Structure formats: structure tokens, C-alpha cells
Amino acid sequence: FLERPHIETTVWVNQQELGMQNSLCVPHVYDLTAATTPGKTYLITIRIDNRIKEINVGPDSHSITDQTQGNWNGIVGRIELQATPKVHLEDIQVYPDLSNQKALVRMNIRSASSTKGEITLSAASFNTDIQHKVAPVHQSFNIRPGDNPVEMELPMGKEFLTWDEFSPALYKLTAKLTNGKQTDTQQVQFGMRDFKIEGKWFYVNGRKTMLRGTVENCDFPLTGYAPMDVASWERVFRICRNYGLNHMRFHSFCPPEAAFIAADLVGFYLQPEGPSWPNHGPRLGNGQPIDKYLMDETIALTKEYGNYASYCMLACGNEPSGRWVAWVSKFVDYWKVVYTQEPPLETAGNGNLTMSIM
């Protein structure tokens, strides 16, 4: 698990290459299972390559530009070896449904063999004076080897707490998989939040809301990269709140997970973006690799951070040039389909996402 590499990583176990990843928005995660055996010693080699290759996000993109963080080389944040049971949960996505007083939970069970067991879901608030515990629900499973999608509903009850800038109540969802004598427990942070457009107004949980925002350009000159800890981002958002703001746009970059955690706690609406300003060099919609890369990146960051209540808006990037109108139209159409389905088709925990084309 490599939380924030910059840019491209290639991983080897001894002499066996496991692959390459180049996301600027989400962690690079490599599965070492097939290349390792318990009880043996291995050499893990990671190569970081920050050269701009065929995928060119643009020299002024704030994900790489020398004007802000710079095109540094390395990994910041967590670097971990993570062990999981042979039967385990992954990709847990929570979709709050305020009108029906429930949350839809989708997840995947990964298993090396056919097996059966039970999943238990529960939730409890954790950051407010008023405490609310959700009664657990159970569901049995009988699965095959590989990936097994599972969907469950978690009734929240009439007294559930909502999240917004005034009262940012949060829940910890606990998902416990029981398989014989083995268990796997995962926790996910989420908020009961609804963010919609009606006419020309934004509404948060039915309340008409004015967004009073600022732009964040990855301006951290003392380090050259965005903070990876929650406390630093809490400080940023609380300073913004002291100036009467409630919203932050991240210009042509996506902040790390710590920013979403902090914004959840403070009560701040966030708009991450695809990591590109496809104007000075690359062009959007001209068939260049940036077309697919931006689509892949926005899907990946929504999957990675979509459970956080503060993630409310998304833009593909900043001020494109080229045949961008047709490309952006398809981009918007894709996300409209994703977020107008009931339940949503794609992973983005809170199920309400406003598109912004910068």
C-alpha cells in the first residue's frame, strides 16, 4: 500500500515484476499474494518515475506544476504491508438514503475458495454530543472463488443524525464477516447527507445552501506537497470557516484522504478534480491518452473517497482546450447516469454528486 506516490510506481518481489500504476489521485495498491509464500524472506523493490510520458496532464496542472507543489519524486503518507484473511471484505461503499431512513451498503467478498458465512453490519455516531447507535443487521452468504458482490440495507431509524456544515454528525459503519472461526472486520466513515440541485439552487438535506468557496492549488511551499495528516487539514478548513467560507475547490488535483476526513469533522463541502489542466500542451477530446486517464482518475477518486460526506462535487479538471465540448458532454452524461439511478450504479458513497466543469 503506497498512499501517495508521485508519479509512476513499478513494484518487484525479488526479480518478479508485479506491474505499474500511475494514479495522481489515489493510493497505489499491489497484491503480493501470488509472488510470496509465508515463512520466506523477500526483497521488495519500488521504482518511482516522475517523468512526464505519454500521459501528459499538462505542465501547469497543480498536480505536478512547479508553480505550486512541483513535480517531485517519491512517496508521501503511509507505506504499508497489509495482511488480509483468505476470505475478506473490500470496497465497502455506503449510499445514504435520507428519505427512506436507511443506508444501502455495497461491498465485495474476496475468497480463494467456495465458502459460506455471515456478514453483520452496525453503525454508531462518534463526533457529536447526541449519540446514536444503529441496530445491527445480518446476512448469510454462500460464495464462489474470486469476487462476490454483496448488497445490504441498514435501517437507520427515525432518530438518525444528518451531516452538514452546521452539524457535521458522522457515523462509523462496522462490517464484520464471519467465516467459520475466522473473522474480518472493516470500518468505514460516512455521513447521512443529501446534496442536490433544484432549479438554480443547491440544497443540503433539503436546506437551501449558498456555497461560499475558495480555491486550493496545493500551495504548501515548506514541503512541496499536500499534508498527509488530518490535523493540518483541520487547521486549513477552520481558518476558512473563520472567514465565513464553507466550500473548497481543489484546482486540477485531488487532495489525500486526510483532507476528506478533516472536512467531514469540520463540516466543509469539497470539490476535488481530475489532476489535469489540459490546455498548455495536451488537449482534451483530441484522442490523446489524457482522455482516458482523466476518466479513469475521476472514477478512481470517487470510489476511494466517495464515502466521505464532505465529497460533494467533482470536476474533470481545469479549463480544457481542444475538442473538449464533446468530451466533457460525454463525461457529464456518464456521471448523470451513475447518479440518477436508484440505487446509484457506481461507487461513490453518498450517492449525490454535483458536476462542475471548470
Language-model features: where?
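Conserved, mostly hydrophobic/aromatic
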Residues: 15, 79, 171, 206, ...
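Short glycine/proline/serine/threonine-rich loop/turn segments at secondary-structure transition edges
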Residues: 36-41, 54-55, 156-170
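Substrate-binding/catalytic cleft of secreted carbohydrate-active enzymes
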Residues: 237-238, 247-358
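Beta-strand-rich binding/interaction modules
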Residues: 13, 102-141, 150
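Short strand-edge motifs at loop-to-beta-strand transitions and within beta-strands
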Residues: 26-30, 146-152
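N-terminal carbohydrate-binding accessory modules
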Residues: 174-240
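Accessory beta-strand-rich segments of carbohydrate-active enzymes
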Residues: 1-88, 112-113, 249, 254-257, ...
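Surface beta-strand/loop "capping" patches
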Residues: 83-114
